[in-house]
């Protein structure tokens, strides 16, 4: 069953792969899964920080989204912490759970 624990376990168990393949320095979840409020149609909200030398951010985010979508069989929204809009930052970060 897909829930907060199973998502966080997968992300934690695959930190090295995520770093090597997608240049992810930090990863976690926020939103409905982080709050245990997910429903059958809920997407998974992923919060990332990429290595500072990354130049192909769009391509990496797209590839990571597809990788996680295939793993979890859910839609994936990825938010880079460096690009959070000011009005949403507090709301997003208060729910964030990093691995």
Regions found by a protein language model. Give the residues of each.
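Short, aliphatic-rich beta-strand segments
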Residues: 43-49
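Hydrophobic alpha-helical positions that pack around
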Residues: 29
